[in-house]
């Protein structure tokens, strides 16, 4: 279940390769 690159559910991967919340 790789949402946006292995981020926690509810998080999205940014161009930096980090994960930030999208809620």
Curated annotation (Swiss-Prot):
GO cellular component, one term: extracellular space
Keyword Disulfide bond: yes
Pfam family, one: GBP_PSP
UniProtKB keywords: Cytokine, Disulfide bond
Cysteine disulfide partners in this protein: 7-19
Signal peptide: none
Family: Belongs to the GBP/PSP1/paralytic peptide family.
Name this protein carries in UniProt: Paralytic peptide 2
